[in-house]
Amino acid sequence: MDRYAEVTRKTGETDIVVKLDLDGCGVCDISTGVPFFDHMLNAFGRHGLFDLTVHAVGDVEVDAHHTVEDTGIVLGEAFCQALGDKAGITRFADAAIAMDETLVMAAVDISGRGQAYCELPVPTERVGSFDTELAVEFFYAFARDAKLTLHVRELAGGNSHHIIEAAFKAVGRTMRRACELDPRVQGIPSTKGLL
């Protein structure tokens, strides 16, 4: 089964192409024009073991908001497409990632219901030129368009870079586990028969 998607989105604010292979080995080619965000997407793909290409051009001269949020939308759509009917997937997963003083937990249910709940207090407004509140905006857009329920919670932390990076790694690892095929799962992993 080929669990791959390629999604393009072009608006007056952004032009984004995402290529996603759920059964990859963490090979990433990321270029969004937002260096810290590139670093986070690379961490997501590598720790999720997804082969991930993200090429985005946005109105970063305004700020990075449109680029980050729209990338979340397109990456979410790519996951939704690559998962297909979701037959045989594990569906539920969680992971806790430690990074020095920081501990962040993520949990997911690939439920067909797109929503995110993030408790990710970051002590500074910026990491370099990156507006730290955009991390949560990314997760909201991603969860909505991937049609999954996502929880991201900071359990400990002090360094803004560590908190955001641990969150992206935790979500990547959680998505890897939830998307994995389990040979014991017969059909759609739901008592309703669909997700």
What are these regions (language model features)?
Residues M1-L195:
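N-terminal intrinsically disordered, cationic/polar leader segments
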